[in-house]
């Protein structure tokens, strides 16, 4: 069953200006070290950060909170599987909120899709509850 859906659109040019103006202070407040390392290795640094910003916004909406109620930017982190598929990793209050939304006997799965077409970066997040597999008899 679907527990939450969120989407967000971020302007890459605005992200580039924000990075230039606030630099490390902004990066350290919003992005995890893993996200920063990924972005700084990319040719399109601002685009990579903008997609991750949009993913955090979309995830907070899917959690039903937006960026309030104690949720921190770094409680939501975008990583990539070896295949390149993006995944959301939740910690802190975001993980607590996810656990509180998940019905008994289910596990939560957070799906994320990222895309960009300059000057826009977009993220879409779906939180799904799947029934837990019954233990073998």
From Swiss-Prot:
Its cofactor is Mg(2+). Its main location: cytoplasm. The keyword Magnesium applies. Mg(2+) binds at residues 8, 57. One of its GO terms (cellular component) is cytoplasm. It catalyses: apo-[ACP] + CoA = holo-[ACP] + adenosine 3',5'-bisphosphate + H(+). GO terms for biological process: fatty acid biosynthetic process. It is an enzyme of class 2 (transferase). Pfam families: ACPS. Its EC number is 2.7.8.7. Keywords: Cytoplasm, Fatty acid biosynthesis, Fatty acid metabolism, Lipid biosynthesis, Lipid metabolism, Magnesium, Metal-binding, Transferase. It is found in: Cytoplasm. One of its GO terms (molecular function) is magnesium ion binding. Belongs to the P-Pant transferase superfamily. AcpS family. Transfers the 4'-phosphopantetheine moiety from coenzyme A to a Ser of acyl-carrier-protein. This is Holo-[acyl-carrier-protein] synthase. It comes from Cereibacter sphaeroides (strain ATCC 17023 / DSM 158 / JCM 6121 / CCUG 31486 / LMG 2827 / NBRC 12203 / NCIMB 8253 / ATH 2.4.1.). The lineage of its organism: Bacteria, Pseudomonadati, Pseudomonadota, Alphaproteobacteria, Rhodobacterales.
